[in-house]
Amino acid sequence: MRVILLGAPGAGKGTQAKFITEKFGIPQISTGDMLRAAVKAGTELGLIAKSVMDSGGLVSDDLIINLVKERISQEDCKNGFLFDGFPRTIPQAEALVKAGVELDAVVEIAVEDEEIVQRIAGRRVHEASGRVYHTVYNPPKVEGKDDVTGDDLVQRKDDTEETVRHRLSVYHSQTKPLVDFYQKLSAAQGKPKYSHIPGVGSVEAITAKVLQALS
């Protein structure tokens, strides 16, 4: 099973990725992990990527695609793989097709922006322990205070409404076109199968829909 999982930050991709990889016995591949592994292993591509990143540059799509091909040729990918956060752009998606990388399914977990803003902007954290609360879904016993220590809870910079809305706008401008790309590819070639799954409701219900889409 060769899957791409799409969805905005906060849509619940990480949770669903875990279920998919366990169910099909496939690795989850993110470009960040892949780059770090290649750099650490000191492969030819890893060394090129390291020199680009060390100089503050962005790793080119060509290099990313070659890393992907190298990664998916490894033994643990023989039953498939799950791409997480890749491809991010149309050129990357087109390059995957050109490189002959076959895909079985593209699953988009769709959640309205306002729901995502509420999910993320409501998070509060106890920094010392890592305990996470939510103002609506999992509030502390005393507002703004950790249940165990009584310390103040904080909102991470990444979780502020302004930051979340910015990340969502980047997602819509970059990744939404991918949805159209894969819908058209699916209509033209019959593959990969494209599924749009509403990411609201219980985790179990969403997982059931995702697994059904992949069956």
Curated annotation (Swiss-Prot):
Residues 30-59 are annotated as: NMP. GO terms for molecular function: adenylate kinase activity; ATP binding. Residues 122-159 are annotated as: LID. The keyword Metal-binding does not apply. GO terms for cellular component: cytoplasm. ATP binds at G10, A11, G12, K13, G14, T15, R123, V132, Y133, G201. Keywords: ATP-binding, Cytoplasm, Kinase, Nucleotide biosynthesis, Nucleotide-binding, Transferase. It catalyses: AMP + ATP = 2 ADP. Consists of three domains, a large central CORE domain and two small peripheral domains, NMPbind and LID, which undergo movements during catalysis. The LID domain closes over the site of phosphoryl transfer upon ATP binding. Assembling and dissambling the active center during each catalytic cycle provides an effective means to prevent ATP hydrolysis. Belongs to the adenylate kinase family. NCBIfam families: adk, PRK00279.1-1, PRK00279.1-2, PRK00279.1-3, PRK14527.1. This is Adenylate kinase. The gene is adk.
